[in-house]
Amino acid sequence: MQEWIILAAAMLATGCVAGVLAGLFGIGGGIVIVPVLESALGVLGVDPAIRMHVAVATSLATIIPTSISSARAHHRRGAVDLDIVRRWAIFVLLGALLGAWIASQLHSRVLALIFASLALLVALKMIFMADSRNLTDDIPRGPWVPVIPAFIGCASSMMGVGGGTFSVMTLTLFNQPIHRAVGTAALFGLVISLPGTIGFVITGFNDARVPVGNLGYVSLIGFALIAPASVLTAPLGARIAHAFSARRLSLMFGAFLIVAAGRLFYRALS
C-alpha cells in the first residue's frame, strides 16, 4: 500500500512538472513523463518488453488535455501561428499514426535509445547553434515540404512527446521567433497526441502482456493521476516563458533535454 502511495505522489508531481514544462517549452511534457513512468512501471513489475510502450502511450494520452491548456495560454498572448498549423496539421497527424505503429514493433530498449539520441541532438542544436544562421527566412513551400511535418509527427509519436521537441527546433531554423515557435508547438501537441494515442490503444489491445487497468498500451491510472495536474500547471509555464529572453529560453530548453537524454541512455545501456 505504501508503495502505491509513493508512486501516486510521484505521478502527481510529474504531472505538475510536465504541465509547467509544456507551457514553458511547448513540449507537452512527455520528455519528463516517459522516463518517470518507465521507472514506475518497473517498480510495479510490468514486463520489460512493453514497459517503454506503456510509458510512451500513456504520455501521449496525458498530452491531449495538457496541449489544449498550453496552446490556449499561448494563443491569448498571440504566440500561436495558426497559418502554419493549418498547412502542416494533416501531415503531422499522418506521421503520428505511422510513429505509433513503428514504436509498437520495437523493443523497449531500442525505443529508449532512439528517444535519448534524438533528444540529445535537439539539445545540442538549441545550446550551441541557437544564434546560428537559419535555413530560410520563412517557412518553405513546395512539394517536398510535407516531409518535415510528417517527420515531426512520426518522431514525436514514437517518443511519446507532444512535438515541441522537434517543432521548436524546426520552426526556429525557419526564422520563427522562439516564443512563437513554442506556442505553435503546443498546438501541434494535440495534433500528434490524439492519433498517436489511438494508434497505441489499437496496437496494444490484444497484447496479453499489458497490465490490468490499461486500455491497449495506455495506463488509465497513470493518465488519471498525471493529466489533471499537468492541465492545471500548463498556463503557469506559458507565463514564465514570456518572461525570459529568446536566448535564455533556448539555453534552458537545451539543458533540460540533455538531462533527460542522459538519464535514458543510462537506463537503456545499464
Residue map of PLM features:
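Hydrophobic alpha-helical transmembrane segments in multi-pass integral membrane proteins
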Residues: 98-102, 154-162, 196-202, 259-270
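Selective transmembrane alpha-helices of multi-pass membrane proteins
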Residues: 92-93, 97, 108-128, 218-235, ...
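Interfacial helix-loop-helix linkers and transmembrane-helix boundary segments
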Residues: 73-87, 106-113, 134-139, 239-249
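Membrane-interface helix termini and inter-helical loops of multi-pass transporters
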Residues: 101-108, 205-217, 268-270
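Small-residue-rich hydrophobic segments that form or flank transmembrane alpha-helices
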Residues: 4-20, 24-87, 91-92, 146-153, ...
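Transmembrane helix exit motif
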Residues: 64-77, 117-140, 238-239, 261-270
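Helix-loop junctions at the membrane-solvent interface of multi-pass transporters
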Residues: 24, 34, 76, 105-106, ...
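Helix-coil boundary and interhelical linker segments in multi-pass alpha-helical membrane proteins
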Residues: 1-3, 42-54, 101-110, 270
